[in-house]
């Protein structure tokens, strides 16, 4: 396949994936929406699904489907197994939605995917906490409905539970490293940053979708999973660093969100890099302005980052990281097709959103 054909194939996969969402909503709501006792709650679930699971890039969910297609020989890709792969892909997207709805409340965010955060909508507020729980429990309802008879059912349940736990541990590290109103720059070390990123982002964004497809393709060996994890966690680290960079230097019309890392006192890659390079005077500027809500203080931190040319530091890091990941793919991809990892790398490097 040449580049254009690959793009067309990907666009088709994406379209099929998005079209499957109506079936997901139907399966989760159709039976009980007219129920005399819980019908109203199911109407709310439908609304929650339709507002929060849609509008992203669908990279995580699509990764399940694309990896499944790469791993399973065409003759065994019958309509039922493809339906299951699409559904498990949507389970990953629902996990993402569960995290994002919760995360936006914790970070006091305003927009997500180019629209108002769910909890910010009139009449929603902190009821969004329970809505997030609904998104999470929908995952296990779908897995039961579609995969209960499959030999990999338990592997998938354990994988989703483990990924949720790891992400929640990462979020805990993130929150305790950046308590609101208590700026302690000494906490922002490279070591702590890497731990946050590995647990909060890399497991569920990169390992989970590939591992899910591996289990569905009958690949359950520890060695194969450990090797895939080695590559995917590194990719996840790069992806989060890129996200931190785009939080401040990205274009909100592209990213769909307005970054809040500076005012939220976050242990971001940019602040870690700044601290590694700062003179005592520059550190003082950071101390006085970081983690504060005032627009002029946020602007002062951004000006400091620009003064220290952190954009150039990032560009160099992106280059080095890409080369490092290519080396890992060469070393650890087999027996899986390298195309799985190369396709993911292609999607994330040089992205703008």
Swiss-Prot record:
<comment type="pathway">
    <text>Isoprenoid biosynthesis; farnesyl diphosphate biosynthesis; farnesyl diphosphate from geranyl diphosphate and isopentenyl diphosphate: step 1/1.</text>
</comment>
<keyword id="KW-0379">Hydroxylation</keyword>
<feature type="binding site">
    <location>
        <position position="266"/>
    </location>
    <ligand>
        <name>dimethylallyl diphosphate</name>
    </ligand>
</feature>
<dbReference type="InterPro" id="IPR000092">
    <property type="entry name" value="Polyprenyl_synt"/>
</dbReference>
<comment type="pathway">
    <text>Isoprenoid biosynthesis; geranyl diphosphate biosynthesis; geranyl diphosphate from dimethylallyl diphosphate and isopentenyl diphosphate: step 1/1.</text>
</comment>
<keyword id="KW-0752">Steroid biosynthesis</keyword>
<keyword id="KW-0444">Lipid biosynthesis</keyword>
<feature type="modified residue" description="N6-(2-hydroxyisobutyryl)lysine; alternate">
    <location>
        <position position="57"/>
    </location>
</feature>
<keyword id="KW-0945">Host-virus interaction</keyword>
<keyword id="KW-0152">Cholesterol biosynthesis</keyword>
<dbReference type="GO" id="GO:0031410">
    <property type="term" value="C:cytoplasmic vesicle"/>
</dbReference>
<feature type="binding site">
    <location>
        <position position="201"/>
    </location>
    <ligand>
        <name>dimethylallyl diphosphate</name>
    </ligand>
</feature>
<keyword id="KW-0007">Acetylation</keyword>
<feature type="binding site">
    <location>
        <position position="107"/>
    </location>
    <ligand>
        <name>Mg(2+) 1</name>
    </ligand>
</feature>
<keyword id="KW-0460">Magnesium</keyword>
<keyword id="KW-0753">Steroid metabolism</keyword>
<dbReference type="Pfam" id="PF00348">
    <property type="entry name" value="polyprenyl_synt"/>
</dbReference>
<feature type="binding site">
    <location>
        <position position="96"/>
    </location>
    <ligand>
        <name>isopentenyl diphosphate</name>
    </ligand>
</feature>
<dbReference type="InterPro" id="IPR008949">
    <property type="entry name" value="Isoprenoid_synthase_dom_sf"/>
</dbReference>
<keyword id="KW-0808">Transferase</keyword>
<feature type="binding site">
    <location>
        <position position="107"/>
    </location>
    <ligand>
        <name>Mg(2+) 2</name>
    </ligand>
</feature>
<keyword id="KW-0443">Lipid metabolism</keyword>
<keyword id="KW-0963">Cytoplasm</keyword>
<comment type="function">
    <text>Key enzyme in isoprenoid biosynthesis which catalyzes the formation of farnesyl diphosphate (FPP), a precursor for several classes of essential metabolites including sterols, dolichols, carotenoids, and ubiquinones. FPP also serves as substrate for protein farnesylation and geranylgeranylation. Catalyzes the sequential condensation of isopentenyl pyrophosphate with the allylic pyrophosphates, dimethylallyl pyrophosphate, and then with the resultant geranylpyrophosphate to the ultimate product farnesyl pyrophosphate.</text>
</comment>
<dbReference type="InterPro" id="IPR033749">
    <property type="entry name" value="Polyprenyl_synt_CS"/>
</dbReference>
<feature type="binding site">
    <location>
        <position position="112"/>
    </location>
    <ligand>
        <name>dimethylallyl diphosphate</name>
    </ligand>
</feature>
<feature type="binding site">
    <location>
        <position position="200"/>
    </location>
    <ligand>
        <name>dimethylallyl diphosphate</name>
    </ligand>
</feature>
<dbReference type="GO" id="GO:0033384">
    <property type="term" value="P:geranyl diphosphate biosynthetic process"/>
</dbReference>
<feature type="binding site">
    <location>
        <position position="57"/>
    </location>
    <ligand>
        <name>isopentenyl diphosphate</name>
    </ligand>
</feature>
<dbReference type="GO" id="GO:0004337">
    <property type="term" value="F:(2E,6E)-farnesyl diphosphate synthase activity"/>
</dbReference>
<protein>
    <recommendedName>
        <fullName>Farnesyl pyrophosphate synthase</fullName>
        <ecNumber>2.5.1.10</ecNumber>
        <ecNumber>2.5.1.1</ecNumber>
    </recommendedName>
</protein>
<keyword id="KW-1207">Sterol metabolism</keyword>
<feature type="binding site">
    <location>
        <position position="60"/>
    </location>
    <ligand>
        <name>isopentenyl diphosphate</name>
    </ligand>
</feature>
<feature type="binding site">
    <location>
        <position position="103"/>
    </location>
    <ligand>
        <name>Mg(2+) 2</name>
    </ligand>
</feature>
<dbReference type="GO" id="GO:0004161">
    <property type="term" value="F:dimethylallyltranstransferase activity"/>
</dbReference>
<feature type="binding site">
    <location>
        <position position="257"/>
    </location>
    <ligand>
        <name>dimethylallyl diphosphate</name>
    </ligand>
</feature>
<comment type="similarity">
    <text>Belongs to the FPP/GGPP synthase family.</text>
</comment>
<feature type="site" description="Important for determining product chain length">
    <location>
        <position position="99"/>
    </location>
</feature>
<feature type="binding site">
    <location>
        <position position="240"/>
    </location>
    <ligand>
        <name>dimethylallyl diphosphate</name>
    </ligand>
</feature>
<keyword id="KW-0479">Metal-binding</keyword>
<feature type="binding site">
    <location>
        <position position="113"/>
    </location>
    <ligand>
        <name>isopentenyl diphosphate</name>
    </ligand>
</feature>
<keyword id="KW-0414">Isoprene biosynthesis</keyword>
